[in-house]
Amino acid sequence: MFGFIHESIRQLVIRKYGEDVWLQVLERSGFENGKENIVNHYYSDTDTYVLVDSVSIVLKVTKDQIWEMYGGFLITYSMEIGWDELVRSMSPNLKGFLDNLDSLHYFIDHVVYKANLRGPSFRCEENPDGTLMLHYFTGRPGLYHIVKGVVKEVAKLVFNLDISLVVQGRTQRSVHMNNGERVEEHVIFLIKNVEEPRRDSDTSTTSALTSVEPDFGEIIDDNLKVSLQDFSRALPYHFVLDESCRLVQCGDELYNHIPNELLQPGTPILRIFEINRPQIPLDFENICNFINAVFVLQVKTSPLRKKHMNAMTKEEREQEVEAMEEEVESNELTQGCHLKLKGQMMMLSTKKHIIYLCSPYVTSINELMQFGMRLTAMPLHDATRDLILLNQQRLSDVEVNLQLEANNEQLETMTHELEVERQKTDSILKDMLPRKIAKQLLSGEHLEPCEYEATVMFCDLPAFQQIIPVCQPKNIVKLLNEVFFKLDRIVVLRGVYKVETVSDSYMTVSGIPDYTSEHAENMCHVALGMMWEARSVMDPVNKTPFLLRIGLHSGTIIAGVVGTKMPRYCLFGETVTLASQMESLGVAGKIQCSSWTYSKAMETGRFEFSPRGRINVKGRGDVETYFLMRSLKKSIWEITDHERDVNVNSIEGYEELEIFIENAQTVKHDGHPKANQNHSATCTIA
């Protein structure tokens, strides 16, 4: 069904029950929010039935009640969105409105939305007692409750009537059409006026329910002054049928689209046309039953075949006609290249003949050219000329709307993808900068450099220079990734900030951007954890576990964001320089701390330090230093978040760390190891 039906159902539920109820309906029916109500989209009947079933279940109302409620709301909603004037101007009474409902339905389907949908048909009869008998035909059984809601609401809003609709009969039959067999439901409604309508003084006295036949008075001269030739030229596409549905006469323009042999009087109309709408067998009785409907007939001959047949002999043309009829019987008729006629069937006064007053069903310039026609083929009085020009503009508007809907859908997809990419970018920025600083930067705040009391740590691999000459570059990168991955885990675990890595040098800081008085204690624990983690990575040259060289210093630093395109959080000050010297002047397998770090660490924590003595630091002279041995407050297992094997490991874990360092120092290294001259060594990465 057409998307407008879904949208009106959505409006009904939201207005009467709220947005939350509609979301429940969507969840139950399996529709994605925003994809269930695309107005110009065609949904399968199954989709619509699932949607209505979900509404019925969520609201705990029967489906018949939902359909009747929808029928009434459909009129209200349609009049709200711009169809008000058209609905009110259709007829002065309810019977006339119902008689013209087919044409309105056809106009909306085929002209406004260009949808070619399979709609219902209506026929209204007036009873002697003033009541109406409405015949409703549809190929979708079970939807007649919509008609009850529609007719009641139209009577109330347009004609100020309070009516009752009673189902008098409901039958189903199988109808054989050219395109196959289908089930058709026929429902008969009896319409009664419950209360006399309220009429203003300036309103016509004509009944609002039924029509009154006009009185033409005496006709002075009943002789027709128009000849058959003039009539055929004035109505160039008409034809007249008898009770046997055989051709009696036709308009001039039909000879340009249909072979002359088929337009001879007495030719069965089924040899010339097939019926598209209403979907009924093309015979005299059915035409009379649907006399108020819009009839669309399709010529069985294409324009190209007609031109080809004009050059044939009479016998060849007869053979071609027979071949054409065989194609129709085998459903090989191509819809796109056969002219359609749209118009009205009218019973003549003899009651034995029907005239079909019609025009080519052409709604655009492209279709006009397709049949080899020009605007001059339409009489000046024919509104089809104006319709073609107006609909050409309408098609452009519909195309623009479809493009806008496609663009909106694409924009939603791009917005979602952009949000995903933005989250990735934010995540990367938060990895590059402290989380607090990254949030301030993303919110557009101006960040001023700040002064902090913090502890800075540098560590490196003293044996790294021995590895470079004997390892492939990709193996070196793999080795550093393995080491730094383990160090990063300790940094995240202990809540300090990793500033940067340069070659094999690793720099971290504690106490910024969120100040803590335990910055020295935290960094000492990080150093012990890193020393433990490094023991699981093997030196590919010496075949021994790696030893880190670590240096710590505490003091005042300046920190701030440098750069805009690629912002970095940088540290400045003498504290950074001295921490770097603590590392470069340190010993492999040892954690060297300045006296400032020693003092700060002992204020908040409990550690075992071994005095190293005074060492000469460039620019500072002799500086008192200490080696950090162990923490008396936390075990290795608590620092590294590793589970202790009670059958193998000591309680604190520092004994294993000391033994590991002693074994790894069988080959003694000073602070500046010499490069290994044995270039024949092989490099293997564990």
Swiss-Prot record:
Heme binds at residue 105. It is found in: Cytoplasm. One of its GO terms (cellular component) is guanylate cyclase complex, soluble. Residues 455-583 form the Guanylate cyclase domain. GO terms for biological process: cGMP-mediated signaling; chemosensory behavior; response to oxygen levels; sensory perception of bitter taste. Synthesizes cyclic GMP (cGMP) from GTP. May be involved in sensitivity to quinine by regulating egl-4 activity through the production of cGMP. Heterodimer; with other soluble guanylate cyclases. This is Soluble guanylate cyclase gcy-34. The lineage of its organism: Eukaryota, Metazoa, Ecdysozoa, Nematoda, Chromadorea.
